[in-house]
Amino acid sequence: FLVDTNIGKASFLEWQEWIEAVNDDLPEPESISEIWDNLPELAKPLIDNVLRQGHKMLIAGPSKAGKSYALIELCCAIAEGGQWLNFSCTKGKVLYVNLELDRASCLHRFKDVYTAMGWEPSNLSNIDVWNLRGKSIPMDKLAPKLIRRAAKKNYIAIVIDPIYKIITGDENSADQMAHFCNQFDKVCTELGCAVIYCHHHSKGGQGSKKSMDRASGSGVFARDPDALLDLIELEPTEELLKQEENKAICAECLAYLKRYYPAYTQDLSQDDELSSAVLLDYCHKMLGNNINLELVKTAIPAAKQRVRQRTAWRIEGTLRE
């Protein structure tokens, strides 16, 4: 017996669309009226006033600007519950995915950062490093492997440095970069942790561009993250360098006076302690010839050299909230 006709789909494509429609795993729409009086709590801060747990942050800057050092310092600050760029960090476990440095150089950098910051390495167990130099794969293939390895580690942040090693597709294509950035959302959602990554500036002058437009490639890079920090180098003026040299000379002179002639506080005013000329003259009178010679010939030239080696940077932040 013929029961009925024209009750199915006209083609395989229609059947495929129907199956996908009934089996999708997307959440259902919700009415705002039902949650108006019982709004969910905001995610807790990971970096105070900058980034929340479970959110994404991009650090952009010119090549060889020290982005990796900044991210390693951030890992250490999260592990120790310290400060990063004067922002307090929530203490917790962090995974640093190293795609660029060789293993030895990467591990040495962590110790160098601890030493330079003067931090006691009390919570090194909070830092895990996944060295993937030479083993990079596109992000859409890396994300499932990353989620599987990090699933039970209770990380509150995953740092990926840098992303150009794992970009899927053309970085200038908006739709391809949208698919690429969706992988970060997948990691955030599956693991409940923040994802922090860095990218380089485009070629050419950056001064005329907004901070959001400096990252190389599609504008998706600027629109996708919840927080965007952009590093731009400043050119110190000669006047500023001389001012910093004056401070450095004063610091060296005062260090020698505290060590060899503590009674200097009775002779020098606060204004005198800010003048390198006054302090050098005072040291010449009060310190012995050998000590003064060591100060003038060794300590002060070294202090001046350290000042001349400094670079100046501005960090511009663009936050979604």
Cite the ranges covered by each PLM segment.
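Short, small/acidic-rich helices and loops at N termini and domain boundaries
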Residues: 1-25
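N-terminal pre-Walker A segment at the start of P-loop NTPase domains
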Residues: 20-46
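Conserved inter-motif catalytic segment of the P-loop NTP-binding fold
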Residues: 34-35, 42, 47, 89-175, ...
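Pre-Walker A (Motif I) flank of P-loop NTPase domains
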Residues: 53-57, 91-93
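Phosphate-binding/switch region of NTP-binding enzymes
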Residues: 58-59, 64, 68-69, 157, ...
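Hydrophobic positions on the alpha1 helix immediately C-terminal to the Walker A/P-loop
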Residues: 70, 74
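Gly/Ala-rich phosphate-binding loop of Rossmann-like dinucleotide-binding domains
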Residues: 79
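Helix C-cap/alpha-to-beta connector motif
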Residues: 84-87
